[in-house]
Amino acid sequence: MTERRKIIELLGSEQASPSVLLKGWIRTLRESKDFSFIEINDGSCLANIQVIVDSDVENYAEIVKLTTGASLAVTGELLESPGKGQRWEIRASSIEILGVAPEDFPLQKKRHTDEYLRTIAHLRPRSNKYGAIFRIRSKLSYAIHKFFQERDFQWIHTPIITGSDCEGAGEMFNVTTLDLNDVPKKDGAIDYEQDFFGKEASLTVSGQLSVETFCLSLGNAYTFGPTFRAENSNTSRHMSEFWMIEPEIAFADLQDDMALGQEFIQYLVNYTVAECAEDLALFAKFVDKNLMATLENIINNDFIRLSYTDAVELLQKSGQKFEYEVKWGSDLQSEHERFLTEQHFKQPVIVYDYPKDIKAFYMRLNNDEKTVAAMDILVPAIGEIIGGSQREERYDVLKQRIIDMNFDEADYWWYLDTRKYGTVPHA
Protein backbone atom coordinates (compact mmCIF):
# COMPACT_ATOMS: atom_id res chain seq x y z
CA MET A 1 0.00 0.00 0.00
CA THR A 2 1.36 3.42 -0.97
CA GLU A 3 2.08 5.64 2.02
CA ARG A 4 0.52 9.08 2.07
CA ARG A 5 2.94 11.94 1.45
CA LYS A 6 2.38 15.57 2.41
CA ILE A 7 2.54 18.49 0.03
CA ILE A 8 5.43 20.12 1.88
CA GLU A 9 7.42 16.92 1.31
CA LEU A 10 6.39 16.53 -2.35
CA LEU A 11 7.27 20.12 -3.24
CA GLY A 12 10.70 19.61 -1.70
CA SER A 13 11.37 16.40 -3.62
CA GLU A 14 14.72 15.97 -5.34
CA GLN A 15 13.42 13.65 -8.04
CA ALA A 16 10.23 12.52 -9.75
CA SER A 17 8.31 9.51 -8.47
CA PRO A 18 6.17 7.01 -10.44
CA SER A 19 3.59 6.66 -7.67
CA VAL A 20 2.61 8.94 -4.82
CA LEU A 21 -0.48 9.18 -2.63
CA LEU A 22 -1.74 12.63 -1.68
CA LYS A 23 -4.76 13.54 0.45
CA GLY A 24 -6.18 17.03 0.88
CA TRP A 25 -8.87 19.58 0.11
CA ILE A 26 -9.72 21.22 -3.19
CA ARG A 27 -8.85 24.91 -3.39
CA THR A 28 -9.72 25.34 -7.08
CA LEU A 29 -10.85 23.12 -9.97
CA ARG A 30 -10.60 24.16 -13.63
CA GLU A 31 -12.25 21.90 -16.19
CA SER A 32 -11.43 21.61 -19.89
CA LYS A 33 -12.51 19.16 -22.58
CA ASP A 34 -9.88 16.45 -22.14
CA PHE A 35 -8.47 17.12 -18.68
CA SER A 36 -8.88 19.24 -15.56
CA PHE A 37 -6.55 21.03 -13.13
CA ILE A 38 -7.12 20.72 -9.39
CA GLU A 39 -5.24 22.79 -6.82
CA ILE A 40 -5.04 20.78 -3.57
CA ASN A 41 -3.90 21.83 -0.12
CA ASP A 42 -3.37 19.51 2.86
CA GLY A 43 -2.42 22.06 5.53
CA SER A 44 1.22 21.00 5.73
CA CYS A 45 2.29 24.25 4.09
CA LEU A 46 0.86 27.36 2.49
CA ALA A 47 1.44 26.20 -1.08
CA ASN A 48 -0.98 24.05 -3.05
CA ILE A 49 0.08 21.35 -5.48
CA GLN A 50 -1.45 21.06 -8.92
CA VAL A 51 -3.06 17.78 -9.91
CA ILE A 52 -3.75 17.04 -13.58
CA VAL A 53 -6.73 14.74 -14.12
CA ASP A 54 -7.19 13.23 -17.57
CA SER A 55 -10.72 12.54 -18.77
CA ASP A 56 -10.03 8.81 -18.89
CA VAL A 57 -9.75 8.61 -15.10
CA GLU A 58 -12.52 6.23 -14.03
CA ASN A 59 -14.79 8.63 -12.09
CA TYR A 60 -13.91 11.77 -14.07
CA ALA A 61 -17.56 12.82 -14.44
CA GLU A 62 -17.99 12.86 -10.66
CA ILE A 63 -14.67 14.61 -10.07
CA VAL A 64 -15.40 17.60 -12.30
CA LYS A 65 -18.62 18.26 -10.38
CA LEU A 66 -16.66 18.81 -7.15
CA THR A 67 -16.26 22.29 -5.70
CA THR A 68 -13.95 24.13 -3.32
CA GLY A 69 -13.66 22.39 0.05
CA ALA A 70 -14.20 18.81 -1.12
CA SER A 71 -11.63 16.27 0.07
CA LEU A 72 -9.76 13.80 -2.12
CA ALA A 73 -7.22 10.98 -2.07
CA VAL A 74 -5.09 11.24 -5.20
CA THR A 75 -2.79 8.51 -6.50
CA GLY A 76 -0.53 9.45 -9.37
CA GLU A 77 2.89 10.27 -10.76
CA LEU A 78 5.01 13.12 -9.42
CA LEU A 79 6.36 15.00 -12.44
CA GLU A 80 8.32 18.15 -13.08
CA SER A 81 5.89 20.94 -13.90
CA PRO A 82 6.38 22.76 -17.21
CA GLY A 83 4.49 25.76 -15.86
CA LYS A 84 5.77 28.60 -13.73
CA GLY A 85 5.26 28.84 -10.00
CA GLN A 86 6.27 25.43 -8.71
CA ARG A 87 8.62 22.66 -9.69
CA TRP A 88 6.33 19.65 -9.27
CA GLU A 89 2.83 18.54 -10.20
CA ILE A 90 0.92 15.26 -10.03
CA ARG A 91 -0.70 13.46 -12.94
CA ALA A 92 -3.51 11.47 -11.35
CA SER A 93 -4.06 7.81 -12.16
CA SER A 94 -6.96 7.45 -9.72
CA ILE A 95 -8.90 9.72 -7.39
CA GLU A 96 -11.07 8.72 -4.45
CA ILE A 97 -13.63 11.28 -3.33
CA LEU A 98 -13.47 11.34 0.46
CA GLY A 99 -15.97 14.10 1.15
CA VAL A 100 -17.99 16.53 -0.94
CA ALA A 101 -18.59 20.20 -0.10
CA PRO A 102 -21.76 21.99 -1.22
CA GLU A 103 -21.39 25.17 -3.26
CA ASP A 104 -22.24 27.24 -0.17
CA PHE A 105 -18.88 26.27 1.43
CA PRO A 106 -18.05 29.47 3.38
CA LEU A 107 -14.39 29.69 2.29
CA GLN A 108 -14.48 30.42 -1.41
CA LYS A 109 -11.36 31.59 -3.27
CA LYS A 110 -11.30 35.23 -2.19
CA ARG A 111 -9.96 37.26 0.71
CA HIS A 112 -12.06 37.19 3.87
CA THR A 113 -12.01 39.66 6.74
CA ASP A 114 -11.01 38.59 10.24
CA GLU A 115 -14.48 39.60 11.39
CA TYR A 116 -16.08 37.20 8.92
CA LEU A 117 -13.64 34.39 9.72
CA ARG A 118 -14.46 34.80 13.40
CA THR A 119 -18.05 33.77 12.61
CA ILE A 120 -16.76 30.48 11.16
CA ALA A 121 -13.97 29.79 13.64
CA HIS A 122 -14.46 26.05 13.11
CA LEU A 123 -13.45 26.42 9.44
CA ARG A 124 -10.98 29.30 9.49
CA PRO A 125 -7.87 27.10 9.99
CA ARG A 126 -8.47 26.11 6.34
CA SER A 127 -7.90 29.73 5.26
CA ASN A 128 -4.41 30.73 4.17
CA LYS A 129 -3.99 33.32 6.91
CA TYR A 130 -5.08 31.20 9.85
CA GLY A 131 -3.40 28.08 8.55
CA ALA A 132 -0.17 30.09 8.52
CA ILE A 133 -0.84 31.46 12.01
CA PHE A 134 -1.27 28.03 13.53
CA ARG A 135 1.71 26.51 11.72
CA ILE A 136 3.88 29.34 13.05
CA ARG A 137 2.40 28.93 16.53
CA SER A 138 3.21 25.21 16.42
CA LYS A 139 6.81 25.88 15.39
CA LEU A 140 7.15 28.54 18.08
CA SER A 141 5.82 26.20 20.76
CA TYR A 142 8.45 23.64 19.80
CA ALA A 143 11.16 26.33 19.75
CA ILE A 144 10.17 27.51 23.24
CA HIS A 145 10.73 24.04 24.68
CA LYS A 146 13.89 23.60 22.60
CA PHE A 147 15.35 26.85 23.95
CA PHE A 148 14.80 25.95 27.59
CA GLN A 149 15.71 22.27 27.28
CA GLU A 150 19.02 23.20 25.62
CA ARG A 151 19.75 25.37 28.67
CA ASP A 152 18.87 22.66 31.20
CA PHE A 153 15.58 24.15 32.42
CA GLN A 154 13.04 21.73 33.90
CA TRP A 155 9.52 21.95 32.42
CA ILE A 156 6.98 22.10 35.25
CA HIS A 157 3.22 21.56 34.90
CA THR A 158 1.71 24.06 37.32
CA PRO A 159 -1.93 23.88 38.52
CA ILE A 160 -4.72 25.38 36.41
CA ILE A 161 -7.08 25.61 39.41
CA THR A 162 -5.69 27.64 42.30
CA GLY A 163 -6.56 29.39 45.53
CA SER A 164 -3.92 32.12 45.04
CA ASP A 165 -4.08 35.36 43.09
CA CYS A 166 -0.52 35.66 41.79
CA GLU A 167 -0.95 39.15 40.34
CA GLY A 168 -3.03 40.51 43.19
CA ALA A 169 -5.51 42.21 40.87
CA GLY A 170 -8.49 40.02 41.74
CA GLU A 171 -9.40 39.58 38.06
CA MET A 172 -9.92 35.82 38.19
CA PHE A 173 -12.49 33.37 36.84
CA ASN A 174 -14.09 31.51 39.72
CA VAL A 175 -14.39 27.72 39.71
CA THR A 176 -17.32 26.31 41.65
CA THR A 177 -19.72 23.39 41.83
CA LEU A 178 -22.20 25.32 43.98
CA ASP A 179 -25.76 25.65 42.69
CA LEU A 180 -25.82 29.24 41.42
CA ASN A 181 -29.61 29.29 41.73
CA ASP A 182 -29.37 28.43 45.42
CA VAL A 183 -25.97 29.57 46.70
CA PRO A 184 -25.35 28.53 50.33
CA LYS A 185 -24.66 31.43 52.68
CA LYS A 186 -22.96 31.73 56.05
CA ASP A 187 -23.05 34.97 58.01
CA GLY A 188 -24.29 36.73 54.87
CA ALA A 189 -21.39 35.55 52.68
CA ILE A 190 -21.03 32.62 50.28
CA ASP A 191 -20.26 29.46 52.23
CA TYR A 192 -17.33 28.05 50.27
CA GLU A 193 -16.94 25.27 52.82
CA GLN A 194 -19.73 23.54 50.91
CA ASP A 195 -17.93 23.96 47.59
CA PHE A 196 -15.88 21.24 45.89
CA PHE A 197 -12.55 22.29 47.42
CA GLY A 198 -13.97 23.58 50.69
CA LYS A 199 -12.74 27.07 49.88
CA GLU A 200 -12.83 29.62 47.07
CA ALA A 201 -11.01 28.51 43.90
CA SER A 202 -10.22 30.14 40.56
CA LEU A 203 -8.55 29.55 37.22
CA THR A 204 -4.91 30.56 37.44
CA VAL A 205 -3.71 33.98 36.27
CA SER A 206 -0.11 32.76 36.41
CA GLY A 207 1.91 29.66 37.23
CA GLN A 208 4.76 31.76 38.55
CA LEU A 209 4.36 31.27 42.30
CA SER A 210 4.20 27.51 41.83
CA VAL A 211 7.14 27.30 39.44
CA GLU A 212 9.22 29.34 41.89
CA THR A 213 9.02 26.46 44.34
CA PHE A 214 10.59 24.19 41.71
CA CYS A 215 13.22 26.77 40.83
CA LEU A 216 14.22 26.78 44.50
CA SER A 217 14.48 22.99 44.42
CA LEU A 218 15.61 21.92 40.95
CA GLY A 219 17.42 25.04 39.77
CA ASN A 220 16.24 26.62 36.54
CA ALA A 221 12.61 25.78 35.72
CA TYR A 222 9.83 27.00 33.46
CA THR A 223 6.13 26.60 32.89
CA PHE A 224 4.32 26.97 29.57
CA GLY A 225 0.57 26.60 29.60
CA PRO A 226 -2.87 28.22 29.65
CA THR A 227 -3.57 31.28 31.77
CA PHE A 228 -6.86 33.07 32.41
CA ARG A 229 -7.65 36.73 33.15
CA ALA A 230 -11.12 38.11 33.82
CA GLU A 231 -10.15 41.55 32.54
CA ASN A 232 -13.06 43.41 30.97
CA SER A 233 -10.91 44.97 28.25
CA ASN A 234 -11.41 44.71 24.50
CA THR A 235 -7.88 45.55 23.38
CA SER A 236 -5.15 43.63 21.57
CA ARG A 237 -3.17 43.64 24.84
CA HIS A 238 -5.73 41.73 26.89
CA MET A 239 -7.14 38.24 26.43
CA SER A 240 -9.34 36.13 28.64
CA GLU A 241 -7.32 33.00 27.83
CA PHE A 242 -3.77 32.71 26.53
CA TRP A 243 -0.65 30.60 26.87
CA MET A 244 2.16 32.07 28.95
CA ILE A 245 5.84 31.19 29.27
CA GLU A 246 7.26 31.68 32.76
CA PRO A 247 10.91 30.78 33.39
CA GLU A 248 12.54 31.04 36.80
CA ILE A 249 16.33 31.24 37.17
CA ALA A 250 17.93 30.19 40.45
CA PHE A 251 20.86 32.18 41.88
CA ALA A 252 20.12 35.07 39.50
CA ASP A 253 19.38 38.79 39.59
CA LEU A 254 17.63 41.30 37.33
CA GLN A 255 20.64 41.55 35.00
CA ASP A 256 20.49 37.80 34.41
CA ASP A 257 16.76 38.05 33.80
CA MET A 258 17.13 40.80 31.20
CA ALA A 259 19.90 38.88 29.42
CA LEU A 260 17.78 35.71 29.27
CA GLY A 261 14.79 37.67 27.97
CA GLN A 262 16.78 39.15 25.10
CA GLU A 263 18.38 35.82 24.24
CA PHE A 264 14.97 34.11 24.30
CA ILE A 265 13.23 36.60 21.99
CA GLN A 266 16.10 36.64 19.50
CA TYR A 267 16.25 32.82 19.49
CA LEU A 268 12.53 32.52 18.74
CA VAL A 269 12.57 35.14 15.99
CA ASN A 270 15.63 33.55 14.39
CA TYR A 271 13.99 30.12 14.54
CA THR A 272 10.74 31.37 13.03
CA VAL A 273 12.46 33.22 10.18
CA ALA A 274 14.41 30.05 9.36
CA GLU A 275 11.53 27.56 9.70
CA CYS A 276 8.46 29.54 8.59
CA ALA A 277 9.70 31.63 5.65
CA GLU A 278 6.72 30.86 3.40
CA ASP A 279 4.10 31.65 6.05
CA LEU A 280 5.92 34.82 7.13
CA ALA A 281 6.00 35.96 3.50
CA LEU A 282 2.19 35.77 3.45
CA PHE A 283 1.96 38.15 6.41
CA ALA A 284 4.63 40.44 4.96
CA LYS A 285 2.58 40.71 1.76
CA PHE A 286 -0.96 41.04 3.10
CA VAL A 287 -0.79 42.04 6.79
CA ASP A 288 2.36 44.05 7.58
CA LYS A 289 4.73 45.07 4.79
CA ASN A 290 7.35 46.02 7.40
CA LEU A 291 7.23 42.63 9.11
CA MET A 292 10.57 41.26 7.94
CA ALA A 293 12.36 44.54 8.68
CA THR A 294 10.89 44.47 12.20
CA LEU A 295 12.05 40.90 12.75
CA GLU A 296 15.54 41.66 11.41
CA ASN A 297 15.70 44.64 13.77
CA ILE A 298 14.97 42.37 16.73
CA ILE A 299 17.52 39.76 15.63
CA ASN A 300 20.38 42.11 14.80
CA ASN A 301 20.32 44.65 17.64
CA ASP A 302 21.16 44.52 21.31
CA PHE A 303 18.20 45.68 23.36
CA ILE A 304 18.55 49.18 24.81
CA ARG A 305 18.38 49.15 28.62
CA LEU A 306 16.65 52.14 30.18
CA SER A 307 15.45 52.72 33.73
CA TYR A 308 11.79 53.56 34.19
CA THR A 309 12.75 56.94 35.66
CA ASP A 310 14.89 57.77 32.61
CA ALA A 311 12.13 56.54 30.29
CA VAL A 312 9.59 58.86 31.92
CA GLU A 313 11.98 61.80 31.65
CA LEU A 314 12.70 61.01 28.00
CA LEU A 315 8.99 60.79 27.17
CA GLN A 316 8.20 64.03 28.99
CA LYS A 317 10.92 65.90 27.10
CA SER A 318 10.09 64.35 23.72
CA GLY A 319 7.57 66.98 22.70
CA GLN A 320 5.29 64.17 21.55
CA LYS A 321 1.58 64.53 22.28
CA PHE A 322 0.24 61.43 24.00
CA GLU A 323 -3.34 60.47 24.79
CA TYR A 324 -2.26 59.38 28.28
CA GLU A 325 -0.18 61.67 30.47
CA VAL A 326 3.37 60.56 31.22
CA LYS A 327 4.16 60.90 34.91
CA TRP A 328 6.35 59.07 37.40
CA GLY A 329 4.30 56.47 39.25
CA SER A 330 2.00 55.60 36.36
CA ASP A 331 2.44 52.56 34.16
CA LEU A 332 3.65 53.13 30.61
CA GLN A 333 0.88 52.85 28.04
CA SER A 334 1.18 51.16 24.65
CA GLU A 335 1.65 54.53 22.93
CA HIS A 336 4.58 55.34 25.24
CA GLU A 337 6.21 51.96 24.66
CA ARG A 338 5.86 52.21 20.89
CA PHE A 339 7.27 55.73 20.84
CA LEU A 340 10.39 54.46 22.59
CA THR A 341 10.86 51.49 20.26
CA GLU A 342 9.61 52.87 16.95
CA GLN A 343 10.43 56.58 16.98
CA HIS A 344 13.16 57.31 19.52
CA PHE A 345 15.47 54.27 19.68
CA LYS A 346 14.03 52.42 16.65
CA GLN A 347 14.96 49.08 18.21
CA PRO A 348 13.92 46.88 21.16
CA VAL A 349 14.11 48.44 24.63
CA ILE A 350 14.19 46.98 28.14
CA VAL A 351 12.69 49.30 30.77
CA TYR A 352 13.61 48.36 34.34
CA ASP A 353 13.26 49.46 37.99
CA TYR A 354 9.55 50.33 38.06
CA PRO A 355 7.72 52.04 40.96
CA LYS A 356 6.78 49.43 43.55
CA ASP A 357 3.17 50.64 43.74
CA ILE A 358 2.39 49.57 40.16
CA LYS A 359 4.08 46.17 40.35
CA ALA A 360 3.39 42.86 42.07
CA PHE A 361 4.21 42.05 45.69
CA TYR A 362 6.79 39.37 44.86
CA MET A 363 9.19 41.73 43.03
CA ARG A 364 12.41 42.60 44.87
CA LEU A 365 12.37 45.98 46.60
CA ASN A 366 15.32 48.13 45.54
CA ASN A 367 17.51 50.03 47.99
CA ASP A 368 15.63 53.29 47.30
CA GLU A 369 12.49 51.56 48.67
CA LYS A 370 10.50 53.30 45.92
CA THR A 371 11.18 50.95 43.02
CA VAL A 372 11.37 47.21 42.44
CA ALA A 373 13.76 45.14 40.32
CA ALA A 374 11.23 44.62 37.53
CA MET A 375 11.66 44.86 33.77
CA ASP A 376 9.56 44.91 30.61
CA ILE A 377 10.93 44.07 27.17
CA LEU A 378 9.41 46.31 24.50
CA VAL A 379 9.67 45.64 20.77
CA PRO A 380 8.65 47.70 17.71
CA ALA A 381 5.11 47.22 16.35
CA ILE A 382 3.93 45.55 19.57
CA GLY A 383 5.18 47.22 22.74
CA GLU A 384 5.53 45.00 25.80
CA ILE A 385 6.25 41.37 24.93
CA ILE A 386 7.90 40.16 28.17
CA GLY A 387 7.50 41.20 31.78
CA GLY A 388 9.86 39.91 34.45
CA SER A 389 11.58 40.67 37.72
CA GLN A 390 14.04 39.60 40.33
CA ARG A 391 11.96 37.97 43.04
CA GLU A 392 11.94 39.18 46.62
CA GLU A 393 14.05 36.57 48.40
CA ARG A 394 14.14 38.26 51.84
CA TYR A 395 11.57 36.72 54.15
CA ASP A 396 10.82 39.81 56.26
CA VAL A 397 10.56 42.14 53.26
CA LEU A 398 8.28 39.74 51.37
CA LYS A 399 6.05 39.25 54.39
CA GLN A 400 5.70 43.01 54.82
CA ARG A 401 4.83 43.43 51.13
CA ILE A 402 2.03 40.86 51.51
CA ILE A 403 0.71 42.78 54.51
CA ASP A 404 1.01 46.13 52.72
CA MET A 405 -1.01 44.77 49.79
CA ASN A 406 -3.79 43.70 52.20
CA PHE A 407 -3.45 40.05 51.18
CA ASP A 408 -4.37 37.28 53.56
CA GLU A 409 -1.02 36.07 54.86
CA ALA A 410 -2.53 32.63 55.50
CA ASP A 411 -2.94 32.15 51.72
CA TYR A 412 0.78 32.62 51.16
CA TRP A 413 2.32 30.68 54.06
CA TRP A 414 3.79 28.12 51.65
CA TYR A 415 5.30 30.85 49.48
CA LEU A 416 6.91 32.46 52.52
CA ASP A 417 8.30 29.06 53.51
CA THR A 418 10.48 29.08 50.38
CA ARG A 419 12.19 32.18 51.79
CA LYS A 420 12.27 30.80 55.30
CA TYR A 421 14.22 27.66 54.43
CA GLY A 422 17.37 28.30 52.41
CA THR A 423 16.31 31.31 50.36
CA VAL A 424 18.39 32.33 47.33
CA PRO A 425 18.30 35.21 44.84
CA HIS A 426 16.24 34.25 41.79
CA ALA A 427 14.50 35.92 38.88
Question: Where does each model-flagged region fall?
Answer:
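Acidic/polar loop patches that form or flank catalytic/metal-binding clefts of enzymes
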Residues: 156, 273-277, 322-326
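A translation/RNA-centric and nucleic-acid-associated enzymatic feature enriched
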Residues: 161, 171-267, 281-427
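Generic non-transmembrane alpha-helical segments
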Residues: 143-151, 264-275
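Residue-level recognition of alpha-helix termini/interfacial anchor residues
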Residues: 59, 276-280
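Class II aminoacyl-tRNA synthetase-like tRNA-binding/catalytic domains
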Residues: 2-250, 422-423
